[in-house]
């Protein structure tokens, strides 16, 4: 019933309330409360199930109505109650929402009367009661109407006809997908070494609804080796839909290219790309303007124009942001919302991690257990850190004060509520400053920071929570009046909603991080962060909703660290594949004569600049030098330019636009001799293909350790706590493993194909430590360079060997 109503019965405007609605937990509690009050003889969660024929189609229609009051006598028909929770008076609900609620109840009424008729009853009428429960007032608002069979049959018939005609079109497309996927052949003449093993393992995993972890070196073809078997599983109807999760645009591009190859060998399949709302919003892109009440004209009458747009996109091979924008313009619809409406009808969906794992923005329809959806998680080495961020939330006193001031003129009540939150944040911090109850994790002239548990209600910042709830209540009241807060506080509101969301799901993996900045200033900055130490449990819970999941990356090591961070069971298959390329094509040189630790950086500058120059002049071409921070990068660039003014290095800049990034990458072309300076873990260090002569070497400066700050220290301390059942060292969890992941990802830019040749320079004495040696890929043939002079000799020898091997091949 829910699926039918959602598809066929929405009319009018797309409604945004301006804030989060009632949570699932609030809705469940309200339902249970009202169901307990039901009179004797009434049934809660009454199951309705009917079989019927409509438009030549056999239909099984089922659902559960909240309360059934059986027919008491001939003069009093049976009554069905449907409960909906709200934060406002039902009279202030948008008409679109009220009609949608009533549509669901009418379909339930139709099912009930048909169920009675199919059992021989002559009942012709049913009483339907919509019960809106106002969570703020803790009060019910019932609305009741009597419906006869003829009216309900007509209403349900119209809804079913719409759905059946759509479903037939979708089934025709689906049969094409199944037939072409079944006969699909691998789009290359041969498998690379390791590719077939990966494809077979991936197929078995998805067929059996299992999980698989894959570390496969760069260049092996992870995308085709996971997508191809997954699509074969679609063809055999083992799966209904594939979700390909990737965090970077470069990852999306590889998926597009892979699907294009499969289309080229006969596959008929639709791919939908979900982009962030901010990147597709027509108002933000200047394509339309909101009215005086903040309403986007593309949301007005959205559901009335949606069917035509949906029909136009069904079965299209490429439902990309560009294709969505074009159709959205034609039908004057919101492009982002149109993409969400197409989500159930695409065969492959490419999107960011957050649409599956983020508790605030995840798309609930993706986790419908009735459908067999599988996850393909690319760049899985980034997932644990991203997930910790998704399950964390923070508030700033300074940002809250700015938000309050922005509301002062036009929304005085909201201003007062936010000011109360500003005071509550200061009071929470003063508790730490004055009572010395909790351990300081940092204290300097400018900053104080404490961590505290969140295990019990007594430990939690209740005053802050109450202040937030009052702000949310006021926002709901404004929304009911058709008023909205100023756009300039939009980002602050997102942080407020996230805090309210995370507060509802706090676990033993959360701690409070409290900071006081400018501690001696007249107006101090206070920050409160609900910080997730390990999101493994949340990831595990999310993955359980899907029919199989494959996590893959070029760097997923060591296994124990990865499984603990991703919530993967120890018995899960873990596939570690060798490099498909000739090891001698890659020279790896360890340079222990350079010390890049923070306190030694100034003294290391001459040796480091000399090292970079030696590598570059050993064979001029395209090189990238990677640093752990922009500050260090800038120091080296300035020193390098003084010593080698004839070379004009390129450098990555913070906050670069997409166009600036493309220009940077465009400088690394075949035949060029570009020397670039970039950041480890940044956009140029992961997911970028530098094929052939586009990159012949990387110089990795330092071990990539994350910057020491309160968050990383809290992460380290939490992992070392006696109650934490981890066999992995806290310093390794917080610093060394994430750093080494960056190093290995960065090194993977060099060799991308069988014909590539290049060098990797590990510039730091710590790389000689046994900890790091144990993490190096097996195919690395490492040479130690004890001085700059020796490095030059080794590089000369390496490039000479490469020239000879190329000549021999030719």
Positions of predicted regions on the chain:
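Metal-dependent nuclease catalytic cores that hydrolyze phosphodiester bonds in DNA/RNA
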Residues: 1-71
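Conserved pre-motif I regulatory segment
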Residues: 172-215
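A substrate-engagement module of RecA-like helicase motors
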Residues: 178-181, 185, 238-349, 357, ...
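Mg2+/Mn2+-dependent nuclease catalytic core
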Residues: 50-153
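Conserved RecA-like P-loop NTPase helicase motor core
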Residues: 592-603, 654-767
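Signature of the SF2 helicase/ATPase Hel1-core->accessory helical subdomain module
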Residues: 226, 331-348, 353-472, 554-568, ...
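A contiguous, basic/glycine-rich beta-loop/short-helix subdomain that forms a polymer-engagement track
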Residues: 324-349, 360-366, 471-595, 603-604, ...
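Walker A/P-loop
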Residues: 207-229
